[in-house]
Amino acid sequence: MKICRLISVCVALTCLSFAAYAQGKPTPKDAVLYFVWPQDGTTIKGGFWCRFGLRNMGVTHAGDNYQNSGHHHLLIDVNEPLDPNEPIAQDKSHLHFGAGQTEARIELPPGKHTLQLVLGDAGHYPFKPPVVSDKITVRIK
């Protein structure tokens, strides 16, 4: 009976510590996330390759819990701030690149669009403080 309780307590503590670790891991102060291409104000005909840049941190797969590394998320036309205590949404405006991609082919309808990169940890949570790019605007013809 005591062994069962001890095992239950150990399992509960392990789960709680993993949840706390996975949400909002700290980041190096000099981490920089940016767009290699396109640049702010670019006018593009049709689909385009979006290339992501990251300095002073590493890129890894979603689910991999390596120190100072994460994976990219591309926010398209998102105006609401991210909640650092919630995982980054996954929908047509929040694209996940959990295989460690550093570029992606993007198709957007004609018009003006905003793009922003966010680095997520193993559980898709933003780091603390968040590692985000500047928001850029592109025009699709």
PLM-predicted stretches and their roles:
Residues 53-64:
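Short amphipathic, basic-aromatic surface patches that mediate peripheral association
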Residues 46, 109-111:
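A glycine-anchored, Pro-Gly-centered beta-turn/N-cap motif
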Residues 64-72, 132:
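Short coil-to-beta strand junction motifs in C2/discoidin
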Residues 24-45:
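Short, compositionally biased P/S/T/A/G/V-rich stretches that sit at domain boundaries
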Residues 17-19:
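N-terminal signal peptide c-region/cleavage motif recognized by signal peptidases
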Residues 81-83, 120-128:
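Short acidic/polar inter-strand loop motif in beta-rich domains
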Residues 129-141:
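Short beta-strand elements
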